[in-house]
Amino acid sequence: PSTVTLNPGPANGSLLPPYFIPVEWGQRFGLPLSEWIVVPALWIGITVGAIGLVIAWRAVTDGWRPRIHLMFYLGVALNMLTAIVPPLTSADVLMYAAYGRLQRLGMNPYDITPAEIFRQAYDPVLVWTERPWQDTPSVYGPIASWSQWLANVLGGESMHDIVFWLQMMAVIPFIVICTVMIKLAHGDAALQTRSVLFTILNPLLIWAVVAGAHNEALTLVFAIIALWFVRKSPFVTGIFIGLAGAVKVSLVFYGLALVWGYRHDWRKVLQLGIGALIPIGILYGVFAPQALFAASRNTGYVSGGSWAPWMRSALAWVLPDAAHGITAALGWIGLFVIGWMLSRVLPWRAVPGAQLPAERDPLTIAVRTAVILCTAWIVTSPYTLSWYDLIVWAPLALLVPTRLDWLMALRGVALSVAYVTGRTVGFSDVMVNVVAFTIRDVISSGVQWFVLIAIIHWFWTTNRQWPTAAFIRNGFGQLLVTADRPQPKRSPLRPWRRPGVAGPR
């Protein structure tokens, strides 16, 4: 344990991970290392990893086709090794454990905070939580809460063992996501390679999701499985997207993408809706009605490193009382504006296996729309973090290479580096008030503004179309119109490649 490595508590003889050098042993060898060593080392590691990712996907564009199974197994090994050491730089996993502990004690984590308990009496699990979220009730959906309860059941009264089970609940869904993405890209070696590179071999996601033990993969895995069933059964697709929404409400964007994909056939929209309502109605309506409203607590936050601090600070000079509200409103407006712009510039390419043109294939439409909506959300939300990017990286793998790949990598590097000092304990005043402030609130926020400006420039110079009245009328006229019948004969889709570059032989 150090300033960047969580202390999950003593193992007390447990043979389970996470494995680490006990504090008393480390002191004999001069451990933990100074913050001025470990923090820059992580900055360098994250940056080098991102550069490696860019080199790899450029190689794919130039014709590199590695053996997918070897790539996949390498990714599995790297992620499992990452998951057996203590989580790094974020104490969120300790809060997951705390919410599960409250449930084991018979309390409601949506009403009671961990601090309300451990300030009154000693608790072997809650005592290991860290600021600043100890006074915050849960904002997670019922499935996420169930996973937190299950980790407590398996881990008993040991925070160490509970953290291990929560790490497994982060890494296993992450691996499943990659597996499904490879299946979705079947028959196209380039897309399959991108699917591995953009998920379990993506250093930015290994760092943000697995090293931080965040529950983003548990959130997304149901939505990705829903994509697998799009061409098979709208009802089953609805079941899985409903389960995704029961982990985190933010998966509503995937739900909207699926509705948009099926919009030409009202019967499929109806089946999708019925399927989604079953898990949502049961899990939210019967087991955890408060969870649906708890998620709204996140909408009022502003995170360091996003575009919002600059805007809020500027507005505070002239409208101090309204600055926060105006910033939040601009985020919502930006969601629609950036979403529209991305819809005009992202190219169409049918997901492998399509029997209809790309613009009419429900899976292709859903994947492209998910990328558009989720990208628009993460780049315009006043509260945005690097592990949120998983919901964009996964479907982005099925699109042709565009400048959005670069923008996602740039954004991910900035936010990941910014939150190396994300914990609120253990750092010196100079590190927090000077270095961390500069990295997070100056450099990272500047990068987020650059990403927004780059998307606007992309739209302005590529396909500057605005939603005219005729466009809107035509769009409404196409809603719920039965889709074209599959064409009986189509030439097989060929893997994309850069013009003038020979493909694999």
What do these predicted regions represent?
Residues 64-167:
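Intramembrane catalytic core of multi-pass membrane enzymes that act on lipidic substrates
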Residues 253-278:
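Perimembrane helix-loop-helix junctions
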Residues 206-209, 225-226, 234-259, 372-379:
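Membrane-interface alpha helices of multi-pass inner-membrane proteins
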Residues 176-180, 219-234, 374:
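Specific aromatic-rich, kink-prone transmembrane helix
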Residues 1-42, 280-374, 399-505:
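Transmembrane helical bundles and short interhelical boundary loops of multi-pass, membrane-embedded
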Residues 65-73, 181-204:
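Transmembrane-helix signature of polytopic, membrane-embedded enzymes
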Residues 40, 142, 146, 156-176, ...:
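Loop-to-helix entry region of an early transmembrane alpha helix in multi-pass inner-membrane enzymes
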Residues 48-58, 161-188, 336-344:
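Transmembrane-helix motifs of polytopic, lipid-linked glycan transferases
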